[in-house]
UniProtKB/Swiss-Prot annotation:
Residues 228-257 are annotated as: Disordered. Signal peptide: none annotated. GO terms for biological process: actin cytoskeleton organization; positive regulation of transcription by RNA polymerase II. One of its GO terms (cellular component) is nucleus. GO terms for molecular function: DNA-binding transcription factor activity; DNA-binding transcription factor activity, RNA polymerase II-specific; protein dimerization activity; serum response element binding. This is Serum response factor. It comes from Gallus gallus. Binds DNA as a multimer, probably a dimer. CDD domains: MADS_SRF_like. The gene is SRF.
Amino acid sequence: PPPGKKTRGRVKIKMEFIDNKLRRYTTFSKRKTGIMKKAYELSTLTGTQVLLLVASETGHVYTFATRKLQPMITSETGKALIQTCLNSPDSPPRSDPTTDQRMSATGFEETDLTYQVSESDSSGETKDVLKPTFTVTNLPGTTSTIQTAPTTSSSMQVSSGPSFPITNYLAPVSASISPSAVTSANGTVLKTTGASAVTSGGLMQIPTGFTLMSGGTMAQQVPVQAIQVHQAPQQTSPSSDSSTDLTQTSPSGTVTLPATIMTSSVPTTVGGHMMYPSPHAVMYAPTSGLADGGLAVLNAFSQTPSAMQVSHSQVQDQGGVPQVFLTAPSGTVQIPVSAVQLHQMAVIGQQSSSGSSLTELQXVNLDTSHNAKSD
């Protein structure tokens, strides 16, 4: 072309890294906008789910995500996973793109990722995510109105701070549907909350059938394990008196929980008895005799013959709170439980109108010399 003439039409540029910083920045911002627009157009025109993530060399992350895929970015686990990936050491710079199929211009079909497509996809998008895990036929002491809602939704929420280990990312299930399970009148919600994370609201839902394995690797990151099991039966006048609270906290610095916490472990009512699951044992008490501290511990570890003993302290006055001490010989059980409090308000099955009968359960850890540390 003559000297004064600018190039007309399209110019094919070389597919290689742009060394000029200014030109590279300009190309990035222009093409980022373009690819975001393309992603939006693709999802709108075809009604498909699109997730696009662009990380700039200045450390900024730009995303486009349709509604179903937004939890991949907004949830705490999703954020942590993205952070981990972006902070990982660089692969060999600008290697031949043909080595990685996903880096080819046409993309790559993830054959092991599929999802359910139904006829009316837009009508109920959350219907596959939360299935009822068990059926409540009748609870002692509740009114017969529970028969109208025989299925009980059960959800498990794991929330933690930035230090939450990424290995617990089990399933990218949307967290936006959790309120539907929480607000149901006879819903049972099992929450596991990390200590550093009481304020951070990142929720992750694990479908039933998954097992949350707490190994020794989590000792530093999740210092306190608290498990709350709420069971509020549906009745004509629901009040806080009929809820059963099981709170287990452990203030010690490193907690190793070798037990597996199943999402299906909710209090089960068997013939007037309440079974309270806990990470180390199943606490079992008849509902009628909770006030006198009659509580047996079924040990979860069968390989240790004498793992836990239960000793009762006598209740002298009528206003006293019965205390039960769980003692574990050192070396048999790996769970240092420092305080277990069991508040039983108006035991289900004998809905007393006079108020709440309070049962407090304290588990005290024994050190090597078997001296009970008094709280």
